[in-house]
Amino acid sequence: MFRGASAVNLDSKGRIAIPTRYRPEILEINQGQMVCTVDIRQPCLLLYPLNQWEIIEQKLSKLSNFNPEERSLQRVMLGYATECELDSAGRILISAPLRQHAKLEKSIMLVGQLNKFEIWSESEWQAQIEKDMTLGASGQFAMSEALSMLSL
Protein backbone atom coordinates (compact mmCIF):
# COMPACT_ATOMS: atom_id res chain seq x y z
CA MET A 1 0.00 0.00 0.00
CA PHE A 2 1.30 3.41 -0.95
CA ARG A 3 0.69 6.31 1.43
CA GLY A 4 2.04 9.81 1.83
CA ALA A 5 3.50 12.50 -0.41
CA SER A 6 7.20 12.52 -1.31
CA ALA A 7 9.15 15.28 -3.02
CA VAL A 8 11.39 13.77 -5.70
CA ASN A 9 13.44 15.20 -8.56
CA LEU A 10 13.13 14.51 -12.26
CA ASP A 11 16.61 14.03 -13.71
CA SER A 12 17.81 15.22 -17.11
CA LYS A 13 16.90 11.85 -18.67
CA GLY A 14 13.29 11.95 -17.41
CA ARG A 15 13.74 9.54 -14.49
CA ILE A 16 12.47 9.74 -10.92
CA ALA A 17 13.66 7.71 -7.96
CA ILE A 18 10.95 5.78 -6.15
CA PRO A 19 11.41 6.29 -2.37
CA THR A 20 13.15 3.33 -0.76
CA ARG A 21 10.22 2.50 1.54
CA TYR A 22 8.12 1.48 -1.49
CA ARG A 23 10.72 -0.47 -3.43
CA PRO A 24 10.48 -3.86 -1.64
CA GLU A 25 6.76 -4.21 -2.40
CA ILE A 26 7.26 -3.20 -6.03
CA LEU A 27 10.18 -5.59 -6.46
CA GLU A 28 8.74 -8.56 -4.56
CA ILE A 29 5.22 -8.55 -5.95
CA ASN A 30 5.79 -7.08 -9.41
CA GLN A 31 9.48 -7.75 -10.14
CA GLY A 32 9.92 -3.98 -10.52
CA GLN A 33 7.31 -3.73 -13.29
CA MET A 34 5.01 -0.69 -13.27
CA VAL A 35 2.68 1.08 -15.72
CA CYS A 36 2.28 4.85 -15.99
CA THR A 37 -0.62 6.62 -17.72
CA VAL A 38 -2.42 9.95 -17.62
CA ASP A 39 -5.19 10.98 -15.28
CA ILE A 40 -7.98 12.25 -17.51
CA ARG A 41 -9.41 14.52 -14.79
CA GLN A 42 -6.26 16.09 -13.37
CA PRO A 43 -2.91 17.33 -14.73
CA CYS A 44 -1.07 14.41 -13.17
CA LEU A 45 0.05 10.88 -13.99
CA LEU A 46 -1.06 7.59 -12.48
CA LEU A 47 1.67 5.05 -11.71
CA TYR A 48 0.50 1.51 -10.98
CA PRO A 49 2.40 -1.62 -9.97
CA LEU A 50 1.83 -4.10 -12.80
CA ASN A 51 -0.58 -6.31 -10.82
CA GLN A 52 -2.80 -3.30 -10.02
CA TRP A 53 -2.67 -2.05 -13.62
CA GLU A 54 -3.85 -5.44 -14.86
CA ILE A 55 -7.01 -4.99 -12.75
CA ILE A 56 -7.58 -1.57 -14.37
CA GLU A 57 -7.01 -3.05 -17.84
CA GLN A 58 -9.65 -5.71 -17.18
CA LYS A 59 -12.15 -3.02 -16.20
CA LEU A 60 -11.29 -0.92 -19.27
CA SER A 61 -11.59 -3.92 -21.58
CA LYS A 62 -15.20 -4.45 -20.42
CA LEU A 63 -16.24 -0.99 -21.59
CA SER A 64 -18.07 -0.66 -24.89
CA ASN A 65 -16.16 0.47 -27.96
CA PHE A 66 -19.48 1.78 -29.29
CA ASN A 67 -20.13 4.18 -26.41
CA PRO A 68 -18.20 7.41 -27.22
CA GLU A 69 -17.40 8.27 -23.59
CA GLU A 70 -16.24 4.76 -22.75
CA ARG A 71 -14.17 4.57 -25.94
CA SER A 72 -12.56 7.92 -25.12
CA LEU A 73 -11.56 6.67 -21.69
CA GLN A 74 -10.05 3.51 -23.19
CA ARG A 75 -8.23 5.48 -25.86
CA VAL A 76 -6.62 7.89 -23.42
CA MET A 77 -5.83 5.55 -20.53
CA LEU A 78 -4.61 2.67 -22.68
CA GLY A 79 -3.06 4.88 -25.35
CA TYR A 80 -0.81 6.64 -22.86
CA ALA A 81 -0.11 3.51 -20.78
CA THR A 82 3.64 2.98 -20.69
CA GLU A 83 5.50 0.14 -19.03
CA CYS A 84 8.16 1.31 -16.60
CA GLU A 85 10.72 -0.91 -14.94
CA LEU A 86 12.43 -0.05 -11.69
CA ASP A 87 16.16 0.06 -12.48
CA SER A 88 18.95 -1.04 -10.13
CA ALA A 89 19.02 2.46 -8.59
CA GLY A 90 15.26 2.40 -7.90
CA ARG A 91 14.38 4.82 -10.70
CA ILE A 92 11.72 4.72 -13.41
CA LEU A 93 11.79 6.52 -16.75
CA ILE A 94 8.78 8.70 -17.53
CA SER A 95 8.26 9.10 -21.27
CA ALA A 96 8.26 12.56 -22.87
CA PRO A 97 4.53 12.50 -23.76
CA LEU A 98 3.65 11.66 -20.16
CA ARG A 99 5.97 14.37 -18.81
CA GLN A 100 4.37 16.90 -21.15
CA HIS A 101 0.82 15.95 -20.11
CA ALA A 102 1.60 16.51 -16.42
CA LYS A 103 3.84 19.55 -17.04
CA LEU A 104 6.66 17.83 -15.19
CA GLU A 105 9.87 19.73 -14.66
CA LYS A 106 12.51 19.20 -11.98
CA SER A 107 10.44 19.27 -8.77
CA ILE A 108 7.92 16.41 -8.60
CA MET A 109 5.48 15.14 -5.99
CA LEU A 110 4.92 11.39 -5.78
CA VAL A 111 1.66 10.88 -3.89
CA GLY A 112 0.61 7.48 -2.56
CA GLN A 113 -3.04 6.56 -3.21
CA LEU A 114 -3.03 3.05 -1.69
CA ASN A 115 -2.93 0.95 -4.90
CA LYS A 116 -1.12 3.52 -7.07
CA PHE A 117 0.85 6.76 -7.07
CA GLU A 118 -0.11 10.11 -8.51
CA ILE A 119 2.80 12.01 -10.07
CA TRP A 120 2.40 15.81 -10.01
CA SER A 121 4.54 18.80 -10.81
CA GLU A 122 5.17 20.49 -7.49
CA SER A 123 3.33 23.67 -8.55
CA GLU A 124 0.26 21.76 -9.81
CA TRP A 125 0.24 19.70 -6.60
CA GLN A 126 0.28 22.82 -4.40
CA ALA A 127 -2.56 24.37 -6.42
CA GLN A 128 -4.63 21.17 -6.18
CA ILE A 129 -4.08 20.83 -2.43
CA GLU A 130 -5.23 24.43 -1.95
CA LYS A 131 -8.42 23.66 -3.90
CA ASP A 132 -8.99 20.46 -1.92
CA MET A 133 -8.48 22.19 1.44
CA THR A 134 -10.82 25.03 0.44
CA LEU A 135 -13.45 22.50 -0.59
CA GLY A 136 -13.07 20.67 2.71
CA ALA A 137 -13.34 23.87 4.73
CA SER A 138 -16.49 24.87 2.84
CA GLY A 139 -18.41 21.86 4.12
CA GLN A 140 -19.19 20.67 0.60
CA PHE A 141 -17.75 17.24 1.36
CA ALA A 142 -20.76 16.64 3.63
CA MET A 143 -23.04 17.08 0.62
CA SER A 144 -21.79 13.79 -0.80
CA GLU A 145 -23.83 10.88 0.55
CA ALA A 146 -20.80 8.58 0.70
CA LEU A 147 -18.64 11.20 2.43
CA SER A 148 -21.37 12.18 4.89
CA MET A 149 -21.22 8.63 6.26
CA LEU A 150 -17.41 8.64 6.57
CA SER A 151 -15.98 9.00 10.05
CA LEU A 152 -12.28 9.86 10.27
Swiss-Prot record:
GO terms for molecular function: DNA-binding transcription factor activity; transcription cis-regulatory region binding. It is found in: Cytoplasm, Nucleoid. InterPro entries: MraZ (IPR003444), MraZ_C (IPR035644), MraZ_dom (IPR020603), MraZ_N (IPR035642), MraZ_sf (IPR038619), SpoVT-AbrB_dom (IPR007159), SpoVT-AbrB_sf (IPR037914). Keywords: Cytoplasm, DNA-binding, Repeat, Transcription, Transcription regulation. One of its GO terms (cellular component) is nucleoid. Its main location: cytoplasm. SUPFAM superfamilies: AbrB/MazE/MraZ-like. GO terms for biological process: negative regulation of DNA-templated transcription initiation. Residues 5-52, 81-124 form the SpoVT-AbrB domain. HAMAP family: MraZ. Belongs to the MraZ family. Forms oligomers. This is Transcriptional regulator MraZ. It comes from Histophilus somni (strain 2336) (Haemophilus somnus). The gene is mraZ.
